[in-house]
């Protein structure tokens, strides 16, 4: 029995354990209790029957007196789910007795368990390890692993007044996204799949529901997986067959089905003229993570390189390297960076470690960077080091320059795009630009510019079976594409 990367996971709260938790947190209302009881019955599975959602996460053991009752109550649900082809993952939150809980899960027919750590034990059932986002043990991550303490995608509540977005420090509305962490996971745990665990905000209602489709798209566009989680009001309304709730659920399933039909995109490689290099661990984790997050907010296209592994021999299209760590590069890293600069590249660092004969010059006094000319390229060194992640992101964006953008979005400050490419398969040369709208309102009159001359592109959107051809308009030195009204997401695929 192995972990299945084709699983589409969803939280399935039910049973005595969830009831006890809600009672302790004073979140138990009559409609919530009714919902928890209904979701614990086999008939509750009608919600996911016939949908792409094929893996349910259930509480299995927490070390309390309700564990035995929980496991007994789940038996009919597990049996009915197996007949529908649904897999179950049991969440085990124990410090002691983990082995017995896992053995009980195996006997009950669960497909896997989710644990915070294995304490060096081996089990006869696949394990999904779950970590706090800032404490992921990358080298020990399971084939599928999970992180918690993630953010709900969309406009930050601190930048909202009613339905109006207020500018953040960037001068733009403050957009929350897990994109940077998904990309980081792909680099630090290659060949593995991360499940992001986060719940909808408490403010979500049927009249103003959280954007579930955006939450899912924000993960899948960057090759991670969201553990789908519904708010209590929506769960209760679905039990009553409320038409509004059914519409929200259908949109969720529509988005899931769309991404399931484009699994090949997950193998596409991130594109960008900037490489962000760090070991992304220990004392370097906070700065590097914040810089990635802020670069993404500024719509900078970048690649991530883990310096704990060998630096890549080939970096086609790369124009700049941001060396984030305080430590000077090792001799092989030094040779790599120096060769890159000598070929005309830009290296950005917080301390100078280049050739001693190079003399600094001020390229731009407002940036507070010293510029060292090295053959055809330069090393840019921050005068005060990298003290503020926000300033590092701003300065990097200015040093790399907009003229090196691979793609730009016009007429909407609450959208973002991700550029990737297929360089391995027979479709070698295909480029993909995925566009996400983080506003609760449709984005209108948005133009996507790409840095290549492209006659046309295939436009993909959830809810449509086939792509439609979108004609490009020459916008030297690239091409403009005028996008249709964008509710949540679209993707443009083209050769170039």
Predicted regions and their residues:
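Glycan-processing catalytic domains of CAZymes
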Residues: 1-323, 331-345, 349-360, 365-388, ...
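C-terminal beta-strand-rich structural cap/linker in extracellular carbohydrate-active enzymes
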Residues: 348, 475-496
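A generic structural signal for beta-strand entry/edge sites
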Residues: 377-378, 428-432, 443, 476-480, ...
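Carbohydrate-binding surface patches
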Residues: 272-297, 336, 416-453
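Solvent-exposed beta-hairpin/edge-strand motifs
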Residues: 449-467
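Glycan-recognition and catalytic regions of carbohydrate-active enzymes
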Residues: 260-272, 288-292, 388-430
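Extracellular/luminal ectodomains and secreted, surface-exposed scaffolds of diverse proteins
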Residues: 466-476
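Short acidic/proline- and small/hydrophobic-mixed sequence motifs that coincide with surface turns
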Residues: 342, 442-444, 467
């Amino acid at each position: 029995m192995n972990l299945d990367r084709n699983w589409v996971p969803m939280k399935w709260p039910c049973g005595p354990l969830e009831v006890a938790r809600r009672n302790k947190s004073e979140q138990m209302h009559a409609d919530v209790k009714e919902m928890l009881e209904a979701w614990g019955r086999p008939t509750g599975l009608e919600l996911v029957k016939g949908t792409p959602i094929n893996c349910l996460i259930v509480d299995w053991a927490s070390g309390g007196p309700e564990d035995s009752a929980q496991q007994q109550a789940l038996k009919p649900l597990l049996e009915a789910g197996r007949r529908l082809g649904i897999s179950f993952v049991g969440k085990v939150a124990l410090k002691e007795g983990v082995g017995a809980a896992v053995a009980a899960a195996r006997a009950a027919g669960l497909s896997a368990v989710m644990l915070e750590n294995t304490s060096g034990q081996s089990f006869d059932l696949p394990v999904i390890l779950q970590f706090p986002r800032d404490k992921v043990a990358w080298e020990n991550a399971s084939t599928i692993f999970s992180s918690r303490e993630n953010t709900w995608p969309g406009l930050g509540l601190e930048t909202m007044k009613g339905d109006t977005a207020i500018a953040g420090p960037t001068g733009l509305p403050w957009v929350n996204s897990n994109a940077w962490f998904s990309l980081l996971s792909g680099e630090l745990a290659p060949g593995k799949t991360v499940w992001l665990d986060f719940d909808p905000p408490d403010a979500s209602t049927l009249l103003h529901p959280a954007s579930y489709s955006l939450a899912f798209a924000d993960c899948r566009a960057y090759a991670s997986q969201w553990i789908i989680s519904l708010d209590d009001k929506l769960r209760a309304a679905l039990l009553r067959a409320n038409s509004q709730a059914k519409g929200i659920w259908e949109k969720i399933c529509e988005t899931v089905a769309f991404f399931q039909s484009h699994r090949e995109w997950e193998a596409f490689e991130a594109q960008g003229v900037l490489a962000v290099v760090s070991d992304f661990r220990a004392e370097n984790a906070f700065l590097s993570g914040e810089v990635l997050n802020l670069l993404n907010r500024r719509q900078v296209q970048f690649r991530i390189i883990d310096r704990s592994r060998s630096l890549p021999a080939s970096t086609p299209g790369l124009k700049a390297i941001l060396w984030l760590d305080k430590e000077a590069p090792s001799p092989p890293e030094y040779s790599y960076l120096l060769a890159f600069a000598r070929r005309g590249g830009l290296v950005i660092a917080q301390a100078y470690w280049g050739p001693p004969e190079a003399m600094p010059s001020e390229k731009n006094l407002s940036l507070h960077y010293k510029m060292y000319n090295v053959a055809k390229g330069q090393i840019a060194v921050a005068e005060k080091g990298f003290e503020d992640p926000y300033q590092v992101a701003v300065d990097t964006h200015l040093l790399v320059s907009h003229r090196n953008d691979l793609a730009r979005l016009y007429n909407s400050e609450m959208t973002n795009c991700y550029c990737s490419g297929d360089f391995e398969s027979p479709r070698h040369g295909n480029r993909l630009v995925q566009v996400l709208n983080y506003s609760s309102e449709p984005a209108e009159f948005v133009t996507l510019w790409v840095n290549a001359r492209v006659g046309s592109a295939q436009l993909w959107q959830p809810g449509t079976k086939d792509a439609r051809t979108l004609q490009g308009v020459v916008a030297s030195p690239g091409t403009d594409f005028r996008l249709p009204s964008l509710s949540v997401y679209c993707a443009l695929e083209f050769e170039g």
